[in-house]
């Protein structure tokens, strides 16, 4: 199997499954394979509770991108970040000119109420942000979501 060819088949890979089935291990392996093939990789962690950073000997992930593996010698870098529905909603509001509303939601504690107002809204917020990252070219082959 040609790793570069495999990784170039899609711009986005979603790794999903029940707890304890190896999602973190598969994600790390895919990211390392893509980086080894020279493809810059962004891992987006959505559950916020995996040991992904430790597989790269890195600190805890945050909403801001962190370089997990710097690349070099023909390999590209592996970056990672967490993504929460609350952060995705706040960023969406700010990006659409609603910074004052986003600040009020945070101050009042109503952010969680808004982010969970309808069934499935948390998933929509996260997937919408992942789609935005992929379209912006930030999530290069493969942007992996746990």
Locate the predicted segments by residue.
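Flexible phosphate-sensing "switch/lid" loops adjacent to ATP/NTP-binding sites
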Residues: 1-14, 21, 26-146
């Amino acid at each position: 199997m040609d790793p570069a060819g495999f990784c170039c088949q899609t711009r986005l890979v979603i790794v999903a499954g029940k707890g304890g089935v190896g999602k973190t291990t598969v994600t790390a392996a895919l990211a390392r394979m893509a980086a080894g093939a020279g493809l810059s990789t962004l891992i987006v962690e959505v559950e916020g509770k995996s040991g992904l950073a430790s597989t790269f000997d890195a600190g805890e992930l945050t909403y801001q991108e962190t370089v997990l593996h710097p690349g070099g010698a023909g390999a590209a870098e592996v970056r990672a970040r967490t993504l929460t529905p609350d952060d995705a909603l706040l960023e969406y509001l700010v990006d659409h000119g609603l910074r004052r509303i986003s600040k009020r939601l945070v101050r009042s504690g109503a952010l969680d109420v808004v982010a969970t107002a309808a069934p499935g809204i948390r998933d929509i917020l996260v997937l919408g942000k992942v789609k935005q990252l992929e379209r912006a070219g930030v999530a290069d082959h493969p942007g992996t979501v746990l």
